[in-house]
Amino acid sequence: MATETKLSQMEEFIRAFLEIDADSNEMIDKQELIKYCQKYRLDMKLIDPWIARFDTDKDNKISIEEFCRGFGLKVSEIRREKDELKKERDGKFPKLPPNIEIIAATMSKTKQYEICCQFKEYVDNTSRTGNDMREVANKMKSLLDNTYGRVWQVVLLTGSYWMNFSHEPFLSIQFKYNNYVCLAWRTPSQ
């Protein structure tokens, strides 16, 4: 049932920045951009507009702060994403319990694990009636808001569903635990 989740254009930009910053100095320069474009056979004409858009201090480099400011992102969240992606590349992330199935997710495996296991714990400690499941949804929203910043949406359901939604970069998940499906995503707080 799990499918490869297509990243949004914003998520692709963030991943590109993190990949271009191979030396992890939180700065990319024109040479690094050229190498990246050559590696992926991208149009070299993209380089100057990228530098013009993000290089606010005109030093021909794009810092992580300039990049985040240009997209309205929080530097701390991009750093966290970078650390979690590195753990994934190194194979250092926890495995989900066998009775949890990821349907779709744009977030790191670490976040997936934390969220899914907490949901499982909440569900396992209830009678699984309507009121208890409403409380699980409330607890999940509170946990997500407090752990990953506001404003999260949480939907719990059984059965089929179709949806289309917008979310903050790398902050959406859809998963199944037993007969429950949990949908969670963070929307902009401003």
UniProtKB/Swiss-Prot annotation:
Chain positions recorded as Ca(2+) binding sites: 55, 57, 59, 61, 66
**Alphabetical keyword list:** Calcium, Metal-binding, Repeat
List the record's Gene Ontology CC terms alphabetically: dynein complex
Domain EF-hand: where? 8-43, 51-77
Tissue expr:
Adult and schistosomula tegument.
Q: Which GO molecular function terms does the record list?
A: calcium ion binding
Q: Which Pfam families match?
A: Dynein_light (PF01221), EF-hand_7 (PF13499)
Provide the GO biological process annotations: microtubule-based process
Q: What is this protein called?
A: Tegument antigen
Q: Which organism is this protein's natural source?
A: Schistosoma mansoni (Blood fluke)
Gene this protein is translated from: A12
